[in-house]
């Protein structure tokens, strides 16, 4: 929730002893924030930003999971996802394709595409990207593997 507009300031006001405030979208910035030594830093949502450069450790050969969309726009009564993860943010098709290609080259055989609602993939990109187009693109990757 801290990445949502205004939440970082609200937390800082209520808990002034907290040195760093950042949300799940900014976990990749943690090292640079800590090494910079600047206390009182908080990072709010950066409109659709997705850090594709985070290191991934996979220990589930031959299965791999690939996030294609983060967040949710549904705000179901019983669910906290939109409040914690924010609104839907899709990765680009090129980014997803590159990750799946790497996985196939590394020998992964079953690749599961992840998201709270994968059918919403691409709607936020406003460039005609759809889940169906992503599936067609990934189906053209050479190699023996299964998409789920």
Q: What are the language-model segments listed below?
A:
Residues 1-121, 136:
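Proteins enriched for Cys/Gly/acidic motifs involved in redox and nucleic-acid/cofactor modification
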Residues 124:
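Active-site core of PLP-dependent enzymes with the aminotransferase class I/II
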Residues 127-148:
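Alpha-helix-loop-beta-strand connector modules within alpha/beta enzyme cores
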């Amino acid at each position: 929730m801290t990445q949502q507009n205004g939440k970082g300031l609200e937390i800082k006001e209520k808990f002034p002893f907290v040195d760093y405030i950042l949300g799940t979208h900014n976990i990749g910035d943690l090292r640079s924030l800590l090494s910079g030594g600047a206390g009182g830093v908080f990072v709010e949502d950066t409109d659709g930003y997705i850090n594709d450069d985070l290191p991934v450790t996979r220990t589930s050969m031959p299965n791999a999971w690939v996030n294609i969309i983060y967040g949710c726009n549904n705000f179901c009564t019983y669910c906290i996802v939109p409040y914690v993860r924010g609104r839907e943010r899709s990765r680009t098709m090129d980014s997803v394709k590159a990750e799946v290609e790497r996985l196939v080259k590394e020998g992964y055989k079953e690749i599961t595409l992840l998201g709270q609602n994968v059918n919403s993939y691409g709607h936020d990109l406003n460039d005609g990207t759809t889940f169906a187009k992503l599936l067609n693109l990934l189906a053209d990757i050479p190699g023996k593997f299964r998409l789920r």
